[in-house]
Regions:
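Bacterial Sec-pathway N-terminal export signals of envelope proteins
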Residues: 21-65, 180-182, 215-260, 269, ...
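Periplasmic alpha-helical coiled-coil/stalk elements that build and connect Gram-negative outer-membrane
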Residues: 23, 27, 51, 133-248, ...
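Small/polar (Gly/Ser/Thr/Ala-rich) solvent-exposed segments
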Residues: 40, 63-82, 92, 103-132, ...
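Transmembrane beta-barrel architecture of outer-membrane proteins
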Residues: 95-97, 143, 188, 271, ...
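A short, hydrophobic C-terminal helix/tail in secreted or cell-surface proteins
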Residues: 390-394
Length: 394
């Protein structure tokens, strides 16, 4: 029972170690996004949007203002007639006033609602731009990940080549012992072994550099023993045009322009509101009474500013011009991304063919070596010919 338990826990530990040493493309992408400092921008953008929406909504709250003035005027209000034996006092030419006013918006022509929509649209543009930047990060992680996978395949082929050269070296050494080969033949094999080892050192150095950069992106310690799992076909980089974040970024900019255009109409609308004024000054509401008095006034106010009509036409033209720039940018992006996708597809096809050809070359070289060994043993081929025939061209 104790032995079974020990084996069970050992198996679990071994499985955990193997799982820890393996890394998928999705995990690398997720860790890179979580570890990248730019990810903090998402929270900051959301906070900024919340602040702006809150500020816009406060436009419905009562607005308080305090004002004061001291003036001297050239004339004052007088009665147009004189009444005998009656001295009618008039206000002084120097006048003073301190006023507190409270305004309450009843209808602002849709200005607050428009500002909220503009805030949301602008925030969405920032978020989509953030997605574009994060996608660029994902693309860099993908390049490192697939670069390491390619190096792993090249290292495997290098190992097979070293094994083949090792067998050739042993065979030539046996031929020397039997007197049918010379040391120069063995040296030729040794030179190719050294070349293969040097190439392996270059591959391993490049792999360590790629792995170090991938570790920096993901924030995860990656050793040279870390195994990267090949993704399935559906896990590869998605080249579907509709899923690119750049397109959503262009769409968000278009929506922002739509909200800006709608905001132009709100500037043409009248404003209605309530107001209450409380003041203290000389004169008060009674202009014929030359003394300081307190007074108040309440009512409904309507204002209508037609000044925006002067610039309305140019403002709309400017928005249309910006919209055309966005559409041009979208077309340029789609053109470039199609070229890039075509180039990447061609590169992948070429790489796969080269790797398949390398595997076939190694297989054929093994067949040639075995056939040459048989000919040497049968006396139909010299050891020198065997050496030249079995040595690869690197």
């Amino acid at each position: 029972m104790d032995m079974k338990r020990t084996v069970f826990f050992f198996t679990l530990s071994l499985a955990a170690m193997l799982a820890h040493a393996q890394l998928t493309l999705e995990e690398c992408q997720r860790r890179a996004q979580d570890n990248y400092p730019l990810v903090r921008q998402y929270g900051l953008i959301e906070k900024a949007r919340g602040y702006d929406l809150s500020n816009a909504g406060k436009g419905y709250l009562p607005q308080f203002s305090l004002s004061g003035k001291a003036t001297y005027q050239s004339d004052i209000t007088r009665l147009p007639v004189e009444i005998p034996n009656l001295d009618i006092k008039t206000a002084s030419k120097d006048q003073y006033q301190v006023m507190l006013e409270v305004q309450q918006t009843l209808w602002d022509g849709g200005d607050i609602r428009s500002r909220k929509r503009l805030t949301c649209a602008a925030s969405e543009v920032e978020l989509e731009k953030q997605h574009v930047d994060m996608y660029a990060l994902t693309d860099r992680v993908n390049q490192l990940f697939f670069g390491i996978l390619l190096l792993d395949e090249q290292l495997k082929q290098n190992s097979l080549l070293q094994e083949d050269l090792g067998r050739t070296h042993k065979q030539v050494a046996d031929y020397i012992a039997n007197g049918i080969a010379t040391l120069s033949d063995l040296d030729a094999v040794s030179v190719e072994q050294l070349n293969t080892r040097q190439h392996r050192v270059e591959l391993e150095t490049t792999r360590r550099a790629y792995l170090s950069m991938l570790a920096a992106f993901t924030g995860k310690d990656l050793s040279s023993e870390t195994v990267l799992l090949k993704p399935a076909a559906e896990e590869n980089i998605d080249r579907q045009m509709n899923n690119r974040p750049e397109l959503r970024w262009y769409d968000a900019q278009g929506e922002q322009l739509h909200q800006q255009e709608a905001a132009l109409n709100t500037r043409l609308m009248p404003r209605f509101g309530l107001f209450v004024q409380g003041a203290y000054g000389n004169p008060g509401l009674n202009m014929l009474k030359d003394e300081f008095n307190a007074y108040y006034m309440a009512g409904v106010r309507m204002s209508w500013n037609f000044g925006s009509l002067y610039t309305l036409k140019n403002d709309r033209r400017r928005i249309d011009n910006t919209r055309q720039q966005i559409e041009t940018g979208r077309d340029v992006f789609l053109f470039n991304i199609r070229l890039q996708a075509t180039q990447q597809d061609a590169g992948i096809v070429s790489m796969r063919r080269q790797m398949a050809d390398d595997d076939e070359i190694i297989r054929l070289r093994g067949n040639i070596r075995r056939a040459a060994e048989a000919k040497v043993q049968n006396g139909t081929m010299t050891a020198v010919s065997y050496t030249h025939l079995t040595l690869p061209t690197i």
